[in-house]
């Protein structure tokens, strides 16, 4: 993944509703979900959901496939994995990113 693709993907995920849509699709796995199912699950109006899905497709994070009269949206798991690899490529100077021995993890943070 190059920098411009990473920026596009991160930009698409930098909006709350789109992040929730993407997480729901990742949770659904390869079978994906229809817009109606996503709308009901996330309580997002159809027109708003359509806009967010278009942005996720444009960023390469989601694919859309017509199945008869329905559209199925699926997470582009390869793209997600490329993004994670891009973000961690230079993590910890090439060493495993694990805490030093003997340290205890602190409480789970909800923000960075």
Predicted regions and their residues:
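N-terminal helix-turn-helix DNA-binding core of bacterial DNA-binding proteins
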Residues: 4-45, 67-79
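Conserved catalytic-core motifs of GNAT/GCN5-like acyltransferases
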Residues: 65-67, 97
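Base-recognition residues in the alpha-helical recognition helix of bacterial helix-turn-helix
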Residues: 23, 50-52
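Amphipathic alpha-helical dimerization/coiled-coil segments
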Residues: 1-5, 23-27, 77-112
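Alpha-helical residues within the helix-turn-helix
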Residues: 40, 57-58
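Divalent metal-coordination and catalytic microenvironments
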Residues: 49, 56, 73
């Amino acid at each position: 993944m190059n920098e411009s693709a990473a920026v596009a993907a991160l930009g698409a995920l930098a909006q709350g509703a789109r992040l929730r849509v993407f997480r729901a699709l990742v949770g659904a796995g390869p079978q994906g979900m229809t817009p109606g199912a996503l709308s009901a699950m996330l309580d997002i109006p159809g027109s708003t959901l359509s806009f967010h899905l278009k942005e996720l497709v444009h960023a390469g994070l989601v694919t859309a496939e017509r199945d008869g009269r329905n559209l199925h949206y699926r997470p582009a798991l390869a793209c997600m994995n490329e993004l994670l690899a891009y973000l961690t490529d230079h993590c910890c100077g090439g060493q495993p990113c694990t805490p030093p021995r003997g340290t205890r993890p602190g409480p789970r943070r909800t923000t960075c």
